[in-house]
Amino acid sequence: HKTIQFIVAALFIASACTDDRDNLMVNDQIGLLHSTYTETEIFRGMDTPYQLFVIKSGKGKQETEVSISVDETVLQSYNTDNGTSIQLLPSDCYTILQPALRLNDSDYRKAFDIKWNADRLSDLLSTGKEYGLPIQMSVVQNFISADDERLKTIIVPTIKEPYLQM
């Protein structure tokens, strides 16, 4: 009889406990790892795609889907704000391999893969002008808030010749 009373009392006390683990944690947010401006080197003869990472921060309890698109207004705003004259990279210089990603609740990062056309880029960049790929990320499913400061980037590629160093 006392054992039953003890078990009931223990269950009652345990149910009154609060979980304070999330008290100082912020809600999940999502954004690009490298926002605003990113330079990348493309080596001739190598077919490695560029990885544009999406980072999820916060409690880590929400899943979401995000997508990217090329947005020329991102480039125009950047040029105006920074006094630059980066030109829009023609669409035959790159391929966005997957324009949408799904992040599960346990994922904290995933990457969009962008494949470059190195030969076309080399011809284009030999003119001496600077070209960029302006990317705008959007949250497709609004289960998670977006970090407005980390939704846009301009990827500026440069062509390098591979070399061996000893």
Features from the language model and the residues they span:
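Sec-dependent signal peptide recognition
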Residues: 1-9
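Localized edge beta-strand/strand-to-loop motifs within extracellular or lumenal beta-rich domains
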Residues: 116-118
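C-terminal motif of bacterial Sec signal peptides marking the signal peptidase cleavage site
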Residues: 13-16
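Acidic/polar, low-complexity intrinsically disordered N-terminal segments immediately downstream
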Residues: 18-103, 107-111, 120-166
